[in-house]
Design a protein with these regions (language model features):
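Sec-dependent N-terminal signal peptides of Gram-negative exported proteins
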Residues: 1-20
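A charged, solvent-exposed segment within the mature domains of Sec-exported extracytoplasmic proteins
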Residues: 116-179
């Protein structure tokens, strides 16, 4: 049985390349997101993704503050690696660390053959006896939040293909084990910006949050997220790929409406790996 600490955080390019001289090449994507709680800006997140053949490496750096850090200042780093296959992502590692307000922590996970094989959380915390335990069987086929966000949605149709919303994603973030059941909601046109390489249309998916284990039944966020029908993710195509990645996320929480919106996306062409 795997015990965890519910750290919260809350891209699928399959065509790697080989240069003519057989040197492996790499594609790099940089996506920036603005994070808000209701109408208040909390900070930003930057995800840098490197892809070579079927391998991926992702690093996310976040900075969140209130009043320029006078009341609150938090920095987070998350990372993931693995492979993208025709059946979906196969993560090998995932990590999340944070530091702020005199507090810090780190979570690390390893995967093998489609299941979690190791979990480390520092500092360790005493498990609440009310917590629903995570079983090893529940971890088979589960993926980490990075793989879930960037490597599950794929389509050759770049114009807001609503078929990318027809899926259920099994997620384990080191604390909670849950399913995200996506379903088509609508297609919307986006305003084109010079700073973004996203396509013109977004597929808007309704998301049903289905908690399975690793949580306390009276957790207020669990209650809000599992009973709302307002969770949305807007998925957009990255030109030149079959990737659909998040452009906009809406997540009701016990503290208010949390949202993340992409402000820019940069795609850099193939280049030799360092």
């Amino acid at each position: 049985m795997v015990q965890g600490n519910p750290y919260r955080e809350s891209p699928c390019l399959l065509c790697g390349a080989l240069a003519e001289d057989s040197i492996a090449t790499e594609t790099r994507l940089v996506a920036n997101y603005r994070v808000d709680l209701d109408n208040f800006n909390l900070g930003s997140f930057r995800f840098t993704t490197r892809l070579s053949a079927s391998d991926y490496r992702v690093r996310g750096d976040g900075h969140f503050s209130i009043l320029g850090g006078l009341l609150y200042d938090l920095r987070t780093t998350t990372a993931g690696s693995g492979k993208v296959t025709s059946a979906g992502p196969e993560p090998t590692t995932y990590s999340l660390s944070y530091a702020g307000g005199g507090d810090s922590g780190q979570l690390r996970m390893s995967f093998d053959a489609g299941t979690v094989t190791a979990l480390s959380i520092v500092p360790q915390q005493t498990r609440d006896p009310r917590e629903i335990p995570v079983t090893q069987a529940q971890l088979v086929g589960a993926i980490d939040p990075i793989a879930a966000a960037f490597f599950r949605a794929r389509s050759d149709d770049p114009n807001g293909d609503l078929k990318v919303c027809d899926q259920t994603v099994p997620v384990f973030d080191g604390g909670w084990r849950y399913d995200l059941a996506l379903s088509p909601k609508r297609k919307v046109a986006l305003q084109r910006k010079a700073s973004t390489a996203y396509s013109r249309y977004a597929a808007v998916c309704r998301v049903e949050f289905k908690p399975i284990s690793g949580y306390e039944p009276d957790d207020p966020n669990i209650k809000v997220m599992s009973h709302t029908d307002a969770i949305e993710v807007w998925l957009v195509s990255v030109p030149g790929t079959d990737m659909y990645v998040p452009y906009h996320i809406l997540l009701p929480t016990d503290s208010g409406l949390l949202s993340a919106t992409s402000t820019s996306l940069r795609v850099e062409g193939n280049r030799p790996q360092p």
